Amino acid sequence: MKKSLFNKIMELIMPPPVKVVKISYISPDARLKGKRIIVTGGTGGLGQTMAKRFVDEGAHVLITGRNVEKLNKVASEIGCEALELDLAKVETLSGFISSALKKLGGIDCLVNNAGVSLHEKALELVTFDGFNQQIDTNLRGPYFLTQKALPHIIKNSYKGKVLFISSETGDTVDFRPYGLTKAAINSLVQGLAHLYSQYNVAINAISPGVTATAMTGINPDNLHYPYNPNGRAYLPEEIAEVATYLLSDASNTISGQIITCNNAKTVNARWKE
């Protein structure tokens, strides 16, 4: 039976039917099945932990890093693709996306994880070079990588996801460039989420508290950290579970959110007795 002109017009103007995904219905180890995910800074710490978790959940993952030898070693260990990338070199990002598309066959999700903190102890210790290094890696690079990736995420995915790894320092009073970059990321996430919701792309950030990684210098075997409300640092595996949920189809209504994972530490900072 031929469709009437009215039905054809209605198909064009009506939104597609909603697919409700219940997380309990998704098979264990398949919550990200078939998703093609880029994880920047995937050679250690939280990036490596997330990449492994995504692979374990059925995703086709590509990690990036600057140390090619380490990058290939980690990729081999967790069973994913790898491409060298220095986010500070924004002129290489278009070529990187082209190479990633060849390896993955498309892009469904981008995880902007790579970052650097110089942990300056005082304002007078912040240098021009150090400031620029943190801005380039933590903000400028992810900004333009997302710009290059979004058209492909929109084109190739039923529900695209972009996830930024922010920090609790983006929600606190601080002079350090690292915190400034994370505050900017939080603003960017909300702006992009509003702009791209019409294209069925969800954009969020995870804002972890102090986590046991090489960046913080905390050993996973000794998580004691008295400045967190629960007296300990967090494991990268804990943050990776949140990331897995946010990339899964069960989180399709969540966008423009900064998911803070620090046991209400930053809430406590604003709490008045």
PLM regions: where:
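Short, small/polar-rich loop/turn modules that mediate ligand/substrate recognition or access, typified
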Residues: 197, 202, 254-256
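Catalytic loop of short-chain dehydrogenase/reductase
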Residues: 154, 161-198, 210
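Short C-terminal tail/terminal secondary-structure segment
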Residues: 19-27, 120, 255-273
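C-terminal substrate-recognition "lid" of short-chain dehydrogenase/reductases
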Residues: 235-261, 266-267
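Substrate-binding pocket helix/loop in short-chain dehydrogenase/reductase
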Residues: 121-123, 127-135, 224
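Non-catalytic terminal and boundary segments that flank Rossmann-like NAD(P)-dependent oxidoreductase
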Residues: 1-34, 272-273
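Conserved glycine-rich cofactor-binding loop
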Residues: 43-44
